[in-house]
Curated annotation (Swiss-Prot):
Residues 782-793 have a biased composition (Polar residues). SUPFAM superfamilies: P-loop containing nucleoside triphosphate hydrolases. Its EC number is 3.6.4.-. Residues 532-685 form the Helicase C-terminal domain. It comes from Arabidopsis thaliana. Residues 151-323 form the Helicase ATP-binding domain. This is Switch 2. One of its GO terms (biological process) is DNA repair. Residues 274-294 form a coiled coil. One of its GO terms (molecular function) is ATP binding.
Amino acid sequence: MSLLHTFKETLKPCGSFPSSSSLRVSSTQELEPSRKPPKSSLSQQLLRLDDSYFLPSKHESKISKTQVEDFDHNEDDHKRNIKFDEEEVDEDDERSIEFGRPGLSRAEFDYSGPYEPLMLSSIGEIPIIHVPASINCRLLEHQREGVKFMYNLYKNNHGGILGDDMGLGKTIQTIAFLAAVYGKDGDAGESCLLESDKGPVLIICPSSIIHNWESEFSRWASFFKVSVYHGSNRDMILEKLKARGVEVLVTSFDTFRIQGPVLSGINWEIVIADEAHRLKNEKSKLYEACLEIKTKKRIGLTGTVMQNKISELFNLFEWVAPGSLGTREHFRDFYDEPLKLGQRATAPERFVQIADKRKQHLGSLLRKYMLRRTKEETIGHLMMGKEDNVVFCQMSQLQRRVYQRMIQLPEIQCLVNKDNPCACGSPLKQSECCRRIVPDGTIWSYLHRDNHDGCDSCPFCLVLPCLMKLQQISNHLELIKPNPKDEPEKQKKDAEFVSTVFGTDIDLLGGISASKSFMDLSDVKHCGKMRALEKLMASWISKGDKILLFSYSVRMLDILEKFLIRKGYSFARLDGSTPTNLRQSLVDDFNASPSKQVFLISTKAGGLGLNLVSANRVVIFDPNWNPSHDLQAQDRSFRYGQKRHVVVFRLLSAGSLEELVYTRQVYKQQLSNIAVAGKMETRYFEGVQDCKEFQGELFGISNLFRDLSDKLFTSDIVELHRDSNIDENKKRSLLETGVSEDEKEEEVMCSYKPEMEKPILKDLGIVYAHRNEDIINIGETTTSTSQRLNGDGNSADRKKKKRKGCSEEEDMSSSNREQKREKYKMLAEFKGMEILEFSRWVLSASPFDREKLLQDFLERVK
């Protein structure tokens, strides 16, 4: 049945589809069937830097992706417990965004499905619960399933999580569900609270998307009485609510954190938490306030159910469905610790087996309270796909020397040697004795300018400031120079610091003051990432690509802006200082204007809410400790309505702290895939999160400030573990799903051949590159239709290719494409049609007809 389900989902008709809060409707002609380029192996990484690799050939562009491709188918580092990679987004950052998700235009309200209600209640059940026809006719099939899921939660008087990927329409699914529960008629809209015994609905969301909720209600369900509890009119809205004049109340997380005692006293019928992952920290005041809400019908909406730690999963489910995952201690001992220990690279087989059993048990439990779908399994057949490349750029010689001086500073050496015995002969550690304070350090002296005896957290108070400096050096040396906007005392401290780390190179870098020279700032010679970016962009621009360029640093955006001006590129820019009323016009202009080549975006200000589907290249200039932030930035371009293949380039400075940032991202994403999706992941790392016994290569202060200049840290880890990708658990899974071990092993072996392109990559200033998809989630829980159709017949050929060392990558890629075409041709011949005629039939056929065709074909193959 899984095979039939895969075929059914991937070959859905691409006709007119309904819109949602983030789904745009296009006509059948606009959704011209196109083929997503085949996924390549790592050894073809250079080809991925060339656009010609991604664009389908003239012949292939006439065949849809569904016709060919879909057959194949945080941290406890020190006593102060600094959680730099797990902290919640500050409300100040939220305010800086103030930009809602894209709304829908009037032209996008064409009906695309049968104008009939969606029945939710069982036959004979009274009252009859249904989604109004005016809403149901615009829903996609996966959205209807989401509405049914939420209604089942509601009917059983408990909460749950709608964990769909960003861009799958969680907002409209929620509105459709509420319209059904409150008995709204899409045409008359007469039902109201005065005639109902139900209480009101509370929606809590980031302040940046409050307007979006208002807008979506007005477009999809204007019959609801919606009010916003935010700002100066709170008292008036509260009185209106008590008078039963409000059906839906929308407020921000920050407002609810402050006004929780007032709002928690109201008998809410349903509470919706949008971006529910904000409830990941059980010690936050927001989480404590949300626990006081009386109703059991709590629904969380989030595309990132788990971001940093498995314990976040418990916190979120403890809010939506208290007790569903047991006690906190039980969850930690039964799920959290075994899953992490079983993921160690050298974990004993017994630990791996226990982790696998606990993973399956947790998955079966989560499915009762969570529905999660990805773009690939829902609307993937309507999109051209995305490829996520991680590019390790060679730092300039000056950058490397400055980085080396930085890690030799007394502050960092104090942290690295904190556990060593003190030189004075005391039995205490250095950090508890003579090296608790660092009076000779520039950074320490500034932090403790008012207290020369240090603070209670010394020396661990130095961790975060030192990490920030290392990240700035990894991006651009100008970033560590004094900022003219800072206070004079801080500028003086920064000047002393710069003088120390620049050393004898100070004149080459223009002195210790911030440069005002346009030519100096726009020059790429002292920045490894900009040198690589210059060559990559030249290739993209020449081929008509449009680029999104993200950075967390506004100062870095200033430098990149000067670089773009110097190169003569036409660009737009959006950051926290961009007025809210101008942001949508900037987005619309970029999407509509072919002359706009680059969009410079602050990741904090534009990581959420922007719809930039005209861009097909996304550059993440600086990585974040939280992997979801980088993924959200990618989704500005990779969303419904994108008609081109999206290629993402994450730029990292090789041999720097950024490699550790990325490897921790990999670790966190793997944990999320294991705990949330029940997938199998390659065991790359020896480190175990929040475990001092197994800090390995990832965790602990010593790893943060390790010198990686003489090695390729990430590359070494990948190469070390490439031969262990198919462990015993994966072998069992592969055999169960009909894919041979040799077949899978050959695929993995052919994915790692970086030596072949090293000379050309070096010319681009790139030391190493790989595709993120090749590192994360190599082991799938299910296999594609084509893999099952293949059977074991080609095993001998694959063994032969493996013995040859996969030397002819280009021939293999061509062979794969031919195999896919041949399979599709076989289906067409079985149907008695030419390929183009069969393509039209696939797009117009009902799911039942397609399913029947596949059943008949499989019977014939057998």
